[in-house]
């Protein structure tokens, strides 16, 4: 444990040095305190769980055990459906129970049930197929050991380091995940060491990347809270050796990649803004069929306007908001991998942009929202785009999601 602490502190010093170069900061940053610990199950700005969980019981010195419920469904209509997709779907997107104990020296988190993860620019998969082909009926489950206020150690199926968007629909201000999200990991099995001290938070992780069951990924993240409303975040995570795994949940190229992010977030009572940059790199690894190097460069801004404003960051019982996401991503290089001929986007050297607009209404436990989204690709490889033959360069979607959060 001493060696791990020293490595984490060394990492923090490096990230602080980088922060002094990349950001204009003030001495006040060291005096502000983060509200709570590192986020383990984050939620967006437009939806929130009820204050009272579905079920709660006391565990004496171990704190209380909370049980929360999620039930959501959607209607999706799209133009130029990808081969194998229909023009429209009606589907349950989440039927989950979340069990957590966030007090005491030993804490647990378990998320169980069905889930769908619609992604811009990718084929739509129904909920049961997505659940069984990805992380199973227990997508996240871990134990967190908290020996003191500053340190914690998480072990199990963890939310992955990297990227700016969580995985599940109700965790986000937009219904669908974005172009940049598709290059990152969602759930990884492994261990993660967390540190929090005032305005500084950090984590280090050893994990299996894109759920490959090969523990050859390391990652680190740091957050600096500049003011009560502004936070800077940086992360790096990546594969340190070749891995031949290639499946629905473990794509060959993404599972051999390295991911870097720079994120800024402003949280106000009327506006939430989060611009971020993302860079991915896939090194040449001939032993697993990756004969060349490639990667992506992307940028995005996520903005939410709270028509009914928050009060000190807390949403009212009747909350009306509009979330918008605009992003651009380009690919470079060519991995020359027979198992992934289209590369990481729509072919080597391709690029794409997207926009999503999501008006949302939440009243107590119930919410309803609609989303209009559009993706356009450029310089795409023949057969890698939209439509039955993969020859169309754009796709529009209209999505409606309703649900209950307890």
Please give the residue ranges for each predicted region.
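Short gly/pro/ser/thr-enriched loop/turn and capping motifs at secondary-structure boundaries
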Residues: 161-162, 240-242
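Extracytoplasmic/secreted cell-surface and envelope-processing proteins
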Residues: 213-215, 243, 284-285
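N-terminal periplasmic/intermembrane-space "pro-region" immediately following the signal or transit peptide
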Residues: 1-7, 11-75, 79, 406
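Intrinsically disordered, low-complexity segments enriched in Ser/Pro/Gly/Ala and basic residues
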Residues: 18-19, 24-25, 143, 293, ...
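Short, structured patches in soluble enzyme cores that scaffold and shape functional sites
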Residues: 195, 204-208, 222-224, 234-238, ...
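Outer membrane beta-barrel
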Residues: 54-219, 223-229, 311-315, 323, ...
């Amino acid at each position: 444990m001493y060696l791990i602490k020293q490595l984490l502190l060394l990492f923090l010093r490096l990230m602080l040095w980088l922060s002094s170069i990349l950001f204009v900061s003030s001495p006040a940053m060291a005096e502000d305190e983060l509200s709570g610990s590192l986020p383990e199950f984050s939620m967006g700005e437009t939806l929130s769980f009820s204050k009272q969980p579905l079920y709660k019981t006391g565990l004496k010195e171990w704190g209380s055990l909370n049980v929360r419920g999620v039930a959501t469904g959607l209607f999706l209509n799209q133009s130029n459906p990808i081969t194998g997709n229909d023009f429209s779907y009606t589907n349950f997107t989440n039927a989950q129970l979340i069990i957590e104990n966030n007090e005491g020296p030993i804490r647990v988190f378990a998320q169980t049930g069905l889930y769908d993860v619609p992604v811009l620019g990718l084929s739509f998969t129904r909920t049961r197929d997505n659940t069984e082909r990805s992380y199973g009926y227990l997508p996240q489950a871990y134990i967190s050991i908290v020996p003191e206020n500053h340190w914690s150690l998480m072990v199990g199926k963890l939310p992955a380091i990297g990227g700016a968007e969580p995985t599940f629909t109700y965790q986000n201000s937009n219904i669908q995940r974005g172009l940049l999200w598709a290059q990152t990991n969602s759930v990884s099995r492994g261990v993660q060491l967390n540190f929090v001290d005032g305005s500084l938070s950090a984590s280090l992780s050893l994990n299996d990347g894109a759920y490959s069951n090969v523990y050859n990924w390391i990652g680190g993240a740091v957050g600096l809270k500049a003011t009560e409303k502004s936070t800077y975040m940086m992360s790096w995570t990546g594969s340190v050796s070749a891995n031949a795994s290639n499946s629905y949940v473990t794509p060959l190229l993404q599972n051999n990649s390295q991911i870097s992010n720079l994120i800024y977030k402003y949280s106000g009572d009327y506006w939430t803004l989060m611009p971020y940059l993302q860079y991915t790199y896939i090194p040449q690894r001939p032993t697993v069929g990756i004969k060349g190097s490639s990667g992506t460069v992307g940028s995005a801004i996520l903005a939410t306007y709270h028509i009914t404003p928050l009060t000190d960051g807390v949403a009212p019982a009747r909350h009306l908001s509009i979330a918008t996401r605009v992003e651009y991503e380009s690919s470079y290089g060519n991995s020359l991998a027979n198992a992934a001929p289209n590369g990481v986007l729509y072919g080597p050297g391709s690029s794409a942009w997207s926009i999503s607009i999501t008006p949302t209404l939440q009243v107590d436990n119930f919410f309803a929202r609609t989303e209009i989204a559009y993706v356009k690709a450029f310089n795409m490889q023949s057969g890698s785009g939209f439509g039955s033959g993969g020859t169309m360069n754009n796709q529009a979607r209209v999505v409606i999601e309703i649900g209950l959060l307890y």
